[in-house]
Amino acid sequence: MTDAEKKVLDEEVVVESVDVEVGTMEDVDAIMKKFDRESNTRVWEGTPKKILRYVLAAFMLFMVYMNLWATWSGQIRRCLFVGFVILFTFFIYPVKKGNVKPNSMPWYDILLAVAGCIPYFYYVANFKRIVAMGIAIGQTEVILGIIGTLVLAECCRRAVGLPILIVAGCFVLYAFIGRGMSMDLVVYNIFYTTNGIIGTPISVCSTYIALFLLFGAFLEATGVANFFIDCANALVGWASGGPAKVAVVSSALCGMVSGSSVGNTVTTGSVTIPMMKRTGYPPEFAGAVEAASSTGGQIMPPIMGAAAFIMAEMTGYEYADIIVRAILPAFLYFLGIFLGVHFKAKKLGLVGLKREELPKWKLLLPKIYLLLPLIVLTWMVVAGQTMAKSAIYGTIVAIVVGIINKDDRMTPSKFVNGLENGGKNCLSIGIACGIAGIISVCITMTGLGGKLITYVVKLSGGNLFIALFLTMICCIILGMGVPTTANYIIMASTCAPILINGMSMHILAANMFVFYFGIVADITPVSYTHLTLPTS
């Protein structure tokens, strides 16, 4: 082959790869809408879109006010949060996938939105009286509690998906059928106590998680995700099988700020998967690498899919201690994937990308200021500042960075977008936390947790490794298709006590163990979402 022919061939390959990548980026929204329940939203246009946008932005500002200056009791804060989340969920998520008629919201959705938030606002308005009633709640409170719970379940079906709802339904049925509890008692525990819907998960979600979601929205607006991908390309793109290594490194970096393994998969996979296929990796291997890497982003400090905040509440350990201790397991996870793709590349004889195709460090280093928000956040947390204060200061720094970023400057419109995205992100996580609270209280009030401990200890014969294996199986089964935050709450309520109380395992080690294997459920074949996205 002559030099001229080689040059033509190289140009054809480059053009083909660019077409694939552009096509993939154009198809991202379609892929997300097809496989990710959270991405199937209503289509609002014109004035209704603007109104909803500013309402969500105002909701996020209200959350900031409530966390920094309001002096209301915990139950009032949580009920207000859940009430608004339910109200906005019906305006964002249609009754089924594919409902794309612009500016359309059927009457029954409006009815459900109003009916769903009324019980929570009723709780706020009658807070002192309801607390004084204790377990002897009246029929009005029982009916409102049932409505509030059922509408929350419908919100979960729309915004989160069926898996966690099915799990919660099984636990509620066990309370009625397995333990013979009355309707009044179940409703009281689920709806009116601080162990149920407005329990610890919602408490953490309405405070720390909401503020960190706001931080993440503004950090994303600075373009830091693209910076991470460019850095990963420059760092390992030239190595043997470079694109797969880029997928691993970029997923780890993006995972530091991402709260969604699906979102992480699409953000990095839309760039790395076409490159992996072009280099010579089999399509199924490319998809598997991206799915495993992006899922691992949920165990990457400091955000850890927002589960780290709830772990701090449930274990009593400082948030800073948790993220420091999570560094080594996260490093080992990604090291294992990195070595796997390296050996696969050597086996297939794959080479890396050409140096001239990769981003230049001299162009990337001037953009290192994009990391300032993350650095400030981590420094404040490790220095012992409160999580709320750290998140707010990190958000302020992210806004400043966005303003001085010449390549993607923060405009007033982008500022409102950041608030809007923060509000939207609160919806699915808030709903998942509410449903997880139902699961948690059912386990507590039925005594099911004690039975699980007894069964596992008997089956394991007191052997820790067998108990760990059995607990791992439980985590993978219960964690399939469940969002990260709710996933951890379920694991901490059902599986962690097995190791802590049954096998005398260290509380933090047990919680880390069940959290990691609950996350691994995302790449278990039955849980198809995270596997289907990258191969699409």
Predicted regions and their residues:
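Membrane-embedded helical hairpins/re-entrant loop segments and their flanking transmembrane helices
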Residues: 212-264, 268-283, 452
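Core transmembrane alpha-helical segments of multi-pass membrane transporters/permeases
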Residues: 118, 154, 158-159, 163-174, ...
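Membrane-interfacial loop-to-helix junctions in multi-pass transporters
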Residues: 139-143, 195-208, 234-248, 279-285, ...
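Hydrophobic mid-bilayer segments of alpha-helices in multi-pass membrane transport proteins
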Residues: 55-57, 77-91, 108-117, 142-151, ...
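Membrane-interfacial helix-loop connectors
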Residues: 267-279, 309-324, 459-461, 475-520, ...
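Alpha-helical transmembrane segments of multi-pass membrane proteins
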Residues: 208-209, 230, 241-255, 281-295, ...
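Conserved, well-structured core domains of diverse proteins
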Residues: 2-132, 142-146
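Conserved small/polar residues in nucleotide/adenosyl-binding loops
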Residues: 529-535
